[in-house]
């Protein structure tokens, strides 16, 4: 289910195709409006350019047990630079394609979606898609913190080539996905004629029993099954609420998983400018060669955070989708106001220790330990489409053996604009 293609060429073709559709537009007049970028629409069709620029600064001060392990890093980096298009051919078919450069690496795709809506409640989607996780489904443009922490690293899957069915009611939804690997991954190419890529199934259901103008309550449950096929074994490796890495691994099981099953819960409550949110995943891992290596372990990961808007805004919860969307700034600088300010504190937790405890033969050292971290966040929005962020993280990994523990003090800044 993997596709290798030129991002630039693909984007150009996509834009040309979408523009040709817009010109046709069934010979109807097209209305124009500005929604962060030019948008053209009539009763049946819509076309819009989209994109984002996220520029980060990261400073890490890392202390490691034992000699020669301490270091400091300081980097400016392009977190995301994306361009794309989205639109609607008619009342039944829609599309989205967006990609660009992430973390200073080569070009790759993010959202690439074809959607078919047979009616208002049902959507059938095909492409590079996320299926579960409250913070995961919330765009990086709108997450309260700069990055999603260990939960986003291995507690839930990011974009995967998938076939997804969704049903949405007024305050509930159900999602089911059949999944492969990312659209950016190379095809599996083993010598065996029967070689195959990873396979996954994900189901999610959410319910918002409270959904008033000032109060929102979100609860959700999801289940994920994965089989690695002939790809590399699943590894459970996390970072310190950042997308930055200098190559140092603070905590990991290494590649151990042949298959796994994940049960996850989500919760969030919004009361005016105050909100609280958390998620937790319990991952049952089936080892490779368990008879030789050891029993099957459980991996646990979760987070919780609290946020508050002193300027009076509230987080924009979509009760039908079970996701958070773009916040509406009450007094943007474009209207002579001061913009919006959000303050937040977050706790992250990951426990990989069972991957070590269940080994038949235990090595003297292992990074399959525990991680805990606290993050303070400040978000300033001059408008709903521009954001400046500051995050400070104090994290600790408690691993096995000498010279394996880390204390991480991390400061990050971000300037962000999207359209």
Question: For each predicted feature, which ranges?
Answer:
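Cleaved targeting-peptide boundary
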Residues: 27-34, 64
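Gram-negative bacterial Sec-dependent N-terminal signal peptides
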Residues: 1-27
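Outer membrane beta-barrel
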Residues: 36-66, 70-229, 299-335, 340-357
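Outer-membrane beta-barrel pore domains
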Residues: 70, 115, 233-419
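Short, solvent-exposed secondary-structure boundary motifs
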Residues: 28-30, 74, 154, 254-258, ...
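Juxtamembrane/membrane-water interface recognition
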Residues: 17-20, 59, 390
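Short solvent-exposed loop/turn micro-motifs enriched in small/polar/acidic residues
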Residues: 31-33, 106-107, 156-158, 258-260, ...
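Domain-scale selection of a single, long terminal region
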Residues: 2-9, 197-205, 211-230, 254-275, ...
């Amino acid at each position: 289910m993997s596709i290798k293609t030129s991002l630039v060429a693909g984007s150009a073709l996509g834009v040309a195709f979408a523009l040709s559709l817009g010109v046709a537009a069934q010979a109807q007049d097209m209305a124009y409006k500005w929604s962060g970028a030019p948008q053209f629409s009539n009763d049946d069709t819509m076309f819009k350019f989209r994109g984002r620029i996220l520029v980060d600064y990261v400073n890490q001060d890392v202390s490691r047990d034992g000699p020669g392990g301490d270091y400091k890093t300081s980097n400016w980096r392009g977190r995301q630079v994306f361009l794309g298009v989205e639109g609607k051919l008619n009342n039944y078919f829609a599309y989205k394609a967006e990609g660009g450069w992430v973390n200073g690496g080569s070009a790759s795709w993010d959202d690439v979606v074809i959607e078919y809506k047979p009616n208002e409640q049902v959507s059938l989607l095909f492409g590079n898609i996320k299926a579960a996780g409250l913070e995961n489904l919330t765009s990086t443009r709108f997450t309260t913190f700069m990055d999603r922490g260990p939960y986003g690293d291995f507690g839930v899957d990011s974009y995967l080539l998938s076939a997804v069915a969704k049903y949405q009611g007024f305050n509930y939804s159900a999602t089911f996905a059949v999944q492969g690997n990312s659209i950016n991954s190379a095809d599996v190419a083993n010598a065996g004629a029967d070689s195959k890529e990873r396979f996954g199934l994900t189901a999610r259901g959410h319910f918002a029993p409270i959904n008033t103008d000032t109060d929102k309550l979100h609860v959700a449950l999801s289940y994920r099954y994965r089989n690695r096929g002939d790809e590399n074994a699943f590894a459970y490796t996390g970072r310190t609420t950042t997308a930055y890495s200098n190559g140092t691994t603070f905590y990991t099981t290494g590649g151990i998983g042949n298959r796994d099953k994940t049960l996850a819960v989500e919760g969030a409550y919004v009361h005016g400018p105050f909100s609280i949110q958390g998620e937790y995943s319990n991952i049952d891992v089936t080892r490779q060669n368990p008879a030789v290596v050891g029993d099957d372990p459980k991996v646990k990961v979760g987070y919780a955070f609290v946020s508050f808007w002193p300027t009076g805004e509230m987080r924009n919860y979509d009760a039908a989708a079970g996701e958070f969307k773009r916040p509406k700034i009450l007094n943007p600088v474009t209207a002579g106001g001061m913009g919006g300010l959000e303050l937040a504190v977050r706790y992250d937790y990951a426990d990989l220790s069972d991957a070590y405890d269940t080994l038949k033969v235990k090595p003297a050292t292992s990074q399959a330990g525990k991680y805990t971290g606290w993050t303070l966040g400040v978000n300033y929005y001059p408008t709903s489409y521009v954001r400046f962020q500051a995050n400070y993280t104090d994290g600790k990994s408690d691993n096995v053996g000498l010279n394996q523990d880390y204390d991480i003090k991390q400061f990050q800044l971000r300037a962000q604009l999207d359209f």
